[in-house]
A protein has these predicted regions:
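A short beta-sheet element
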Residues: 1-2, 103-166, 174-178, 182-186
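Short Cys/His-rich Zn2+-coordinating modules
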Residues: 4, 84-86, 111
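Amphipathic alpha-helical coiled-coil/heptad-repeat segments
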Residues: 7-70, 192-236
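Non-catalytic DNA-recognition/assembly elements of restriction-modification systems
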Residues: 11, 58-84, 91-105
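Hydrophobic aliphatic residues
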Residues: 49, 76-79, 166, 234
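A short, aromatic/hydrophobic, helix- or strand-capping loop or linear motif
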Residues: 84-89, 174-177, 221
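Short amphipathic alpha-helical segments embedded in low-complexity Lys/Glu-rich regions
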Residues: 91, 180-183, 224
């Protein structure tokens, strides 16, 4: 076998490189900790908001009314996603295939591909297979597949509010074998419903935390990509 020659920098340069990379690693560690703390803060606030330990007030300073306990079928019409023809699906978004397809997955919010048609305009979807009970507010026309559960509000509701509250529910599978959740099973779960105005205040507050979490997540990814690029340049 032939010899492999390694091009090594001087010890002084090696020390500078190691120090610089350590600083980048420390930055990534700090951002990761910040992301964890923000996520924990959101979780804690959700518990307090949905248990009504913390209440918002109306814009005029008055107190909102009492929340009303309801089963989900009293608030939503619940349907299940089905199949879609292969000819109606594209992996790439185009002017024709412009509607997102969502399936039963907790990755990338269940995104599957693009369709040339939609089934529902706005709804909350809930995973009914695998990792059960993950709710996502869908605020644009979409097509659900693979038995993804779709909650269509009977009257005007804030979808983000119900996304967050459903995600706090302890949803368990009633079937043996592969975990699954059916529309009739989901319909019996109970939630507490405030006025639409209070729903919106809670949803906006939680969305503001989500935005901060997303910014930090992007910063972490950018720092990791930057480090990767630096390493590639250094050792070419």
């Amino acid at each position: 076998m032939g010899e492999v020659l390694l091009k090594l920098p001087s010890k002084e340069e090696q020390t500078k490189i190691a120090s610089f990379l350590s600083a980048v690693d420390e930055k990534i560690s700090q951002l990761t900790k910040k992301h964890e703390l923000l996520s924990q803060y959101k979780q804690g606030m959700m518990q307090k908001l949905f248990s009504q330990q913390i209440r918002f007030k109306a814009d005029d300073g008055s107190e909102f009314g009492e929340w009303e306990g309801k089963e989900l079928h009293q608030i939503f019409q619940i349907k299940a996603g089905g199949d879609i023809e292969k000819s109606s699906v594209s992996e790439v978004r185009t002017s024709e295939f412009s509607y997102p397809i969502f399936a039963n997955s907790d990755k990338n919010k269940g995104f599957y591909g693009w369709a040339n048609k939609f089934k529902y305009k706005e709804a909350v979807t809930v995973t009914g297979r695998g990792n059960l009970g993950i709710a996502v507010a869908r605020n644009e026309p979409f097509y659900p597949i693979v038995r993804l559960l779709v909650l269509l509000p009977l009257v005007k509701q804030n979808l983000k509010f119900f996304e967050e509250q459903i995600n706090l529910l302890d949803i368990v599978s009633e079937s043996t074998g592969v975990p699954q959740l059916t529309a009739p099973q989901l319909s019996k779960y109970k939630v507490n419903v405030p006025s639409l105005e209070e729903q919106t205040k809670i949803a906006n507050f939680l969305s503001s935390i989500d935005q901060k979490i997303e910014v930090v997540a992007q910063q972490i990814e950018q720092a990791k990509q930057w480090k990767k690029g630096l390493l590639q340049q250094m050792f070419i």
